């Protein structure tokens, strides 16, 4: 154990003033040379405009930000450590609570990593992959709507808040119908998805697709040409491509700087290479460019969802491996659909072997060959990666999340320093951090 002097100066070049040393005239002269309005303030962690319990330590000279430091960790929940004490299936229920605004992306990245270690990536049913893509794109739109609503509210556009949450509610109703929950779904599982789409889900999604394009046009009419909105975002929070790459920023931050880096295109998964969509980019690298990128991404997600609905064919939604899938998941009805309550009731009540098999899988889980993998997906905030290590048992040896919120927060100093204190709100909002994922 190493001991350190708590009174040591962290920065050797910083001036040290004591009551027993130094020439007081020199001390007074040194302080007099500083800006008379220099102050240090805390923004957060209890602040309505920091997207959760984010703390910013700002050094100000008048209204200008001379230094911006990020303090994280206030929402640490030990998700990664808890996964080491749960089976590979149970870990999904923890990971879905990391980035609580886009849980389906964390679930997918984790399940893809497990499937890669199991060597069953190519065995995932087509219907399961289509459902995964469709759910993720719905979740992408929902996440961007929260960003639009909260970001608009923070800079005074209260109408954007009302409209954003209005449309998001439609998506949450779809999620509730399909997964049973509005958030923290644990719907995507190793090998596929937990259950098939219920009756009426496709119709409800098509209804949303009919409504949403006009609503996006409404957002543009409301905000894109609005003078106050443009002045609050244009030229604010600038970060060029060199800075974004140096700081590891991904997602809309990088695409707003002009680089079309999207993992759905450059490293496809779940069959994304077969879908027709564009990667929106801008070149200005400011808050307004990030706003335009996210608005365009919602349109592209609608295109992908439309293609998913056209590709839905009857079939299983779980890999046909009895060592991984529960017996009820391997049943198909006459219509080609599976996982209805009738199927589960029939299998669990008539087959003792199936009941025993189900009990063993639920209580002990399945074994995953030893090894380690890293699997990234394109979340609404950027590259969300899962580094999974297996020791050959039924529980993960290590699960690490490469959370884009955590990495992207490194850009706070770059986008805030030199600007006005009022622009800090807009700059942080354009980064769109979710502290549940950042602190996890």
Curated annotation (Swiss-Prot):
It comes from the Bacteria. Signal peptide: none annotated. Keywords: Cell membrane, Membrane, NAD, Quinone, Translocase, Transport. One of its GO terms (molecular function) is quinone binding. InterPro entries: NADH_Q_OxRdtase_suD, NADH_UbQ_OxRdtase_49kDa_CS, NDH1_su_D/H, NiFe-Hase_large. Its main location: membrane. The keyword NAD applies. Gene3D superfamilies: Cytochrome-c3 Hydrogenase, chain B (1.10.645.10). It is a peripheral membrane protein. Belongs to the complex I 49 kDa subunit family. NDH-1 is composed of 14 different subunits. Subunits NuoB, C, D, E, F, and G constitute the peripheral sector of the complex. This is NADH-quinone oxidoreductase subunit D. It comes from Acidothermus cellulolyticus (strain ATCC 43068 / DSM 8971 / 11B). The gene is nuoD.
């Amino acid at each position: 154990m190493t001991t350190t002097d708590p009174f040591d100066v962290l920065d050797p070049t910083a001036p040290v003033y004591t009551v027993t040393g130094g020439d007081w005239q020199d001390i007074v002269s040194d302080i007099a040379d500083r800006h008379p309005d220099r102050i240090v303030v805390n923004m957060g962690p209890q602040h309505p405009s920091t997207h959760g319990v984010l703390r910013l330590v700002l050094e100000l000279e008048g209204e200008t930000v001379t230094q911006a430091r990020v303090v994280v960790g206030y929402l640490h929940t030990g998700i990664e450590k808890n996964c080491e004490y749960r089976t590979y299936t149970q870990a999904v229920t923890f990971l879905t609570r990391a980035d609580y605004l886009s849980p389906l992306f964390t679930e997918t990245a984790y399940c893809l990593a497990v499937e890669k270690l199991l060597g069953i990536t190519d065995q995932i049913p087509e219907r399961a992959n289509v459902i995964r893509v469709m759910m993720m794109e719905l979740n992408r739109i929902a996440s961007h709507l929260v960003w639009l609503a909260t970001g608009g509210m923070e800079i005074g556009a209260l109408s954007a808040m009302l409209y954003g949450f209005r449309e998001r509610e439609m998506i949450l109703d779809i999620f509730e119908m399909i997964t049973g929950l509005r958030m923290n779904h644990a719907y995507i599982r190793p090998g596929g998805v937990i259950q098939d789409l219920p009756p009426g889900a496709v119709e409800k999604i098509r209804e949303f697709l009919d409504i949403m394009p006009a609503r996006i046009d409404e957002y543009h009419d409301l905000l894109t040409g609005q003078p106050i909105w443009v002045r609050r975002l244009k030229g604010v929070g600038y970060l060029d491509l060199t800075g974004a790459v140096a700081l590891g920023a991904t997602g809309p931050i990088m695409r707003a700087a002009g680089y079309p880096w999207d993992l759905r295109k450059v490293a496809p998964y779940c069959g994304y290479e077969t879908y027709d969509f564009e990667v929106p980019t801008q070149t200005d690298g400011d808050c307004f460019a990030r706003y335009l990128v996210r608005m365009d991404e919602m349109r592209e997600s609608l295109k992908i969802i439309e293609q998913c609905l056209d590709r839905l064919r009857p079939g299983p939604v779980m890999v046909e491996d009895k060592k991984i899938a529960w017996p009820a998941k391997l049943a198909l009805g006459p219509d080609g659909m599976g996982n209805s309550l009738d199927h589960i009731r029939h299998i669990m009540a008539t087959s003792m072997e199936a009941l025993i098999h189900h009990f063993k899988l639920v209580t002990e889980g399945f074994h995953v060959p030893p090894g380690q993998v890293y699997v990234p997906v394109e979340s609404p905030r950027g590259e969300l990666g899962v580094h999974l290590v297996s020791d050959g048992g039924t529980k993960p040896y290590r699960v690490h999340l490469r959370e884009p919120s955590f990495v992207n927060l490194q850009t706070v100093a770059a986008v805030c320093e030199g600007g006005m204190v009022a622009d800090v709100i807009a700059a942080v909002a354009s980064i769109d951090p979710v502290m549940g994922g950042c602190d996890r």
